[in-house]
Amino acid sequence: MLKLFKILVPVLLIASCGMKPSIEDDKLSDRKFSLEEFFDGETTAYGQFQDILGNVSRRFTVDITGSWDGSNLRLIEDFVYEDGSEEQRIWNLVKTSDNGWIGSADGVIGKAEGLTSGDM
């Protein structure tokens, strides 16, 4: 019995690693992801910068205030870094299709283009 347990547990652990949700898997929820709904209001996020080897060089918290007027999504991002420095970036996003967006912000060269996919 112990021998079977020693074989079965590692096999189940390995099998479970391959069954993680994917962004392409629309079956995780019945609600389609809506960028404008998600960011309309207050959101807090946490992040970090790291190099190619995974070494963290800087951490931050960002408070995001979003407002949606029916065609434009405005995001005011207030960053606070772990060293106490602060930065603000204001994004203006325009919905170009059912899941397409184009955005711009001061300090960003060119336009950002993106697509939404998946569920909430």
Where are these regions (language model features)?
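Extracellular beta-rich ligand/substrate-recognition surface
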Residues: 22-25
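Exposed boundary/loop context
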Residues: 9-11, 34, 59
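C-terminal motif of bacterial Sec signal peptides marking the signal peptidase cleavage site
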Residues: 15-16
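Sec-dependent signal peptide recognition
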Residues: 2-10
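N-terminal helix-cap/turn-to-beta initiation motif at the start of protein domains
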Residues: 27-42
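Central antiparallel beta-sheet cores of small beta-barrel/beta-sandwich binding domains
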Residues: 46, 50-120
